[in-house]
Amino acid sequence: MKSRRQNVSVARQTILGRDENFEPIPIDLVIEIFSRSPVKSIARCRCVSKLWASILRLPYFTELYLTKSCARPRLLFACQKHRELFFFSTPQPHNPNESSSPLAASFHMKIPFDGRFNIISPIGGLVFVRYEQILKGRKTPEFVSAICNPSTGQSLTLPKPKTRKRIWGTSHFGYDPIEKQFKVLSMNIGDGVYKEHYVLTLGTENLSWRRIECSIPHVHGSKGICINGVLYYRAKADMFSGTLMIVCFDVRFEKFSYIKILKPTTTLISYNGKLASLVWEGPSYICGKRFEMWVLGDPEKHEWLKHTYELRPRWQNVLGEDLLIFAGMTGTNEIVLSPKYPSHPFYVFYYNLERNTIRRVEIQGMGAFKVNEDYIFLDHVEDVKLI
């Protein structure tokens, strides 16, 4: 990393001005200053000079910024207004003892669409989006797949897999922490099950799909979650079967396996680095006075550990009359609940498993937008790496 260690004396006029009394600033110090700057400041600094732009593109800097961002995760919101999808984020409160002051949402980017859209669970600072769009020369909308980075405002349209199947099933987004690779898994339907499975690896010179084999007949049933390099998603044996399972896809080795589940699951979450399932006694929204969390013990033996949580009656004063759904779980083991029918003012709720306490946090700055309850994501990080 010789270029990182050199001094900026050759470009002092760009960084320090023309005053010869100043000593040149080491690149390491410049990088450290930038790593503490807000993500929007990074975008502006890229336009100041070629030297600054080159510094902010160094792999060392982007990795350093990402590492620091992981220590301050954010809530990511996808909001719909007319035919545009807007991305906002707020700091994610991680200290159960801190006061629940209102949080101001920051706008990042928007995506136009012409029909339906679907957001696959984001990973790190990247978001995988599928949306309908009327392409040039066409009269009807077609689905487009894209990888977006809300922090930089960039998006990358993915090529379509070459397949004869007309009925496309679903897609998932995974990350291999060993090889540090993002991968997209896509499947299409034939005879009631997924017949063809394709993988695309991001970061390669030529983006292309590779067909892989899967020996487990299944059809998709829920959004997935990637934990420690394994992508999990709920599925059925076929479109007409009531047999449920959780399919496991090893992102690095691109191999499939499955886990039996004892109860229908509402939300898959990560609990202390393990797969867990939140189960409510009733519909998909929260009702009643208790819920269960099933934590995967031994995946090879299909063993689950059951935890039951009782809701205190006085919580009704905090929750109000809203119907709530599970949005996920934070790294500090707080379950995040969001309204099924968002209103103004807009709140999210944090339930602490260890303390058996709940707090309400107001989110400001999105009043003019429709917040879709299915598109509130936890542990989003700001990534300044350009796509």
Curated annotation (Swiss-Prot):
Gene3D superfamilies found in the cross-reference section: 1.20.1280.50
UniProt-listed GO biological process terms: abscisic acid-activated signaling pathway; cellular response to water deprivation; negative regulation of abscisic acid-activated signaling pathway; protein ubiquitination; regulation of stomatal movement; response to abscisic acid; response to water deprivation; stomatal movement
Pathway: Protein modification; protein ubiquitination
SMART domains registered for this protein in UniProt: FBOX
Keyword rRNA-binding appears in the UniProt entry: no
Tissues expressing the protein: Strongly expressed in guard cells. Mostly represented in seedlings, leaves and flowers, and, to a lower extent, in roots and siliques.
SUPFAM superfamilies: F-box domain
Key words of the record: Abscisic acid signaling pathway, Ubl conjugation pathway
Keyword Transmembrane helix: no
Summary of the function given for this chain in its UniProt record: Component of SCF(ASK-cullin-F-box) E3 ubiquitin ligase complexes, which may mediate the ubiquitination and subsequent proteasomal degradation of target proteins. Negative regulator of guard cell abscisic acid (ABA) signaling, especially during drought stress.
Subunit structure: Part of a SCF (ASK-cullin-F-box) protein ligase complex. Interacts with ASK14 and CUL1.
Comment, domains: The F-box is necessary for the interaction with ASK proteins.
Record-given protein name: F-box protein DOR
Originating organism: Arabidopsis thaliana
Lineage, uppermost ranks: Eukaryota, Viridiplantae, Streptophyta, Embryophyta, Tracheophyta
